[in-house]
Structure formats: structure tokens, C-alpha cells
Amino acid sequence: MRRFTVTLFLVFFLVAPAYPMTVEEAVQHALGHNPDLQALRLEEGTAKGLLEKARLLLINNPTIGGNISKKDKPEEEGGGAFTNYGFKLSQEFEVAGQRGSRIAVAENEFDRVKAGIKDRERVLISEVKDAFTKVLALKKKNGLTREIVQLKEELLGLTKIKFQAGDISGLDVNLAEVELSKAKRDLLLNEREYRESLFTLQGFLGLSPDRSFALEGDLPSEAPSLPDRAALQEAAYAKRPDARATVFEVEKTKAALKLARKEVIPNVTLSGFYDRDELRNVVGLEISIPFPIFDRKQAEKKEAHAKAEGARIKCDGQKKTIEREVEQAYSDLAAAIEELTLFKKEIIVKAAENLNLLNLAFKEGKVGFFEVRLAQKDTIEAQVAYIEAQTRTQLAVNAIEKTTGGSLK
């Protein structure tokens, strides 16, 4: 009884359960737990802090100063000592509208950072969907490879029986053994590739390798409809966050160039002071303006102009890049749809049924070993090609959604 209790404890508490997960759940988990995305989101707080600073009414803090001194009186004035002291309060003011330009720079930077975060989410969603698709495909290939191993084992058993009966030669038995060894090797390779794909998916999801989960879903069995190419281009320009980010960068550099030009105009410093000595009290105002003779922000203006021109060029290049990506994704989807339509699920099922009938005919001696071997090869190749066509179709759909920044559904 005690041993039974310990066994139950191990089953329920030490064996990690496999959590079911759909592709939608995987995407949501990645958006909430991916470490790279979490680190990138912190940049929004930095940009928000810079915006708050830019909105300050006065960018410079006031300055307060003071002085104190002691002085001896002449003997003819009675001797002794007296103390002089004074205070001065200064404030620097911008008079060329630099605050408005500074706010424009910070606002566009804040919007650019938010768009950059959205763009990283767009890319992450595509990466998760691609990894999810590859895991499903390898899982399906693993199942097929196990069936192939079982099929080869059955064929080897039949060949040994027929060899003992004198119906076939030893060469056929050797070929069957070689085919079985190759099938087992393929199974090991597929299982290793499947584990590696799971680790990749876990990395995108922010999960530790010891976290066990079971993927729910299947590869597409029917070809999706091909969307309109022009509509895809329009959707990409309108929805993609990286397109908006380049626009915000252009506006930011324009505002920065205006700010550099305004900073040539010197700031005005106003000061109020109070001085006291043994004879009088003095209260007054003081104004100071630096002369921009040597430093006229030449380097800052050149730097801002270069950045503005670079941002404009990058924005134009981004449009062409998006156009190429949409064209490539559209072509890949069209090719994948055409390939998938060549396969019908019913045909694949019938091919497997025909193979079973052929194996039965071989067992009864109606067909030879090489006919069965050739039929197995053709059926296996057709099933593998069908899985690969399904995989390419789903990856093409994922690419379309990535390039357009939306969903085809």
C-alpha cells in the first residue's frame, strides 16, 4: 500500500503535465513573456521621460548666488568692522521658440518608439507562427516515420517467411533489412529535429526547456484563397508599424533641424540682486545676452541636416522594401497554393490503402518483393511531399500576414 501511495505521488507531483496550447495561445504567451520584447518595451518609458522633460516650461533651473565680506572702518571714522553681503537670483529664458521644437522632437521620438515596439510584436508573431508550424510539421513527419518503420518491420518479417519457404532470395531479405535500418535512422533524425524545433518555439515564448506542452492544431488541408495583390500593398503601407516608424523618424529629424537653427539665437538671462553695506541697501535687475560670434551651432546644424536627409532616404527605401516583401510573399503563396492543390487528402488515403492491399497480395504470393518495395517508396514520397506542401502553404500564409501587418482571416 505504501509503495502504491509513493507511485501516485510521483505521477501527480513529479511528472510535469503537458499543457495544451493552440497557435493563438502561443502568440499571446509570447507577447506577454518574450524577454527581448519585454526589454524593448522599457524604451517607451525612456521616451516618455524625455517628452515630459521637453514639456517643461523652463528648461534651465534658476541660479542663486551670494557674497559676504568684512571690512574695517578707518580710525578717523571711529574704527571697528562692518559686514557687506548680497544675494543674486538668475534665470535663463529661451526666446526663439525652442521649447515647441523640442516638444515636437520628443513627441515624434515617443511615437517612433511605440511603433518600433509594435513592429517587434509583428515580427515576433510571425516567428512564433512559423516555429509553431514547423513543430506541427515535424510532429506529423514523426508519426509518418513511425508508420514507415512499422511497415518496414512487417515487410522484413514477410520476406523472412518467404525466404524460408524458398519463394525469394536472400538478397531480398538483405534489402528489407537495409530499408528498415534507414527508416529507423530517419526516425532518430526526425525526433532530434523535432526536439530542436520545440526548443526554438520555447525560446520565442519565454519558456524554460523543462516546460512541457502539447501543441494543438493541424496543417492546412485545403488551399486558401489568393488575396488581391493591390489590396495587400495598400494594407502593408497602412498597417505596418515599421512604415509608420520611419515617418515619425522623418518628422523627428525635421523638428531637430528646426531646433538646431533656433538655438543659434542666444538665450536671455535675467537676474535680480540685493546688496547691503554699512551705508546703503541696493536692489536691482540685471540682463545678460551672449554674443553668438564664434559658436553659431554650425556642427549641430550640419548633423541635424544629415540626419534629416538620412531619415528621408530611409523612409523612401522602406516603401520599396515593403513593396518587394509583399511581392515575394504573394509569389510564394501563389506557388504554395498551386502545389497544395495537386494533392488531395482522399488520394493520399487511397494510396495508403492500396499499399496495404499490395502488402497483402505480397503475403499471398501474388506480387513480388520489388513491386511492394517500389509501391512503398512511391506512397511514402507522396505522403512526405503532401506534408511539405502543407507546411509551405502555412508558412506562406504567415509571411503574407507578416508583410501586411494583419491577418488573412
Please name every model-derived segment:
Residues 21, 117-235, 329-332, 336, ...:
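Periplasmic alpha-helical coiled-coil/stalk elements that build and connect Gram-negative outer-membrane
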Residues 7-16:
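Bacterial N-terminal signal peptides
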Residues 39-54, 120-147, 153-156, 161, ...:
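Amphipathic alpha-helical coiled-coil segments
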Residues 190, 241-242, 389:
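Metallo-beta-lactamase
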Residues 1-4:
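Positively charged n-region of N-terminal signal peptides that target proteins for export
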Residues 21-27:
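Regulatory alphaC helix of protein kinase catalytic domains
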Residues 104-107, 170-179, 369-377:
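Short, charged, amphipathic alpha-helical segments
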Residues 28-94, 207, 233-302, 309, ...:
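A small-residue-enriched
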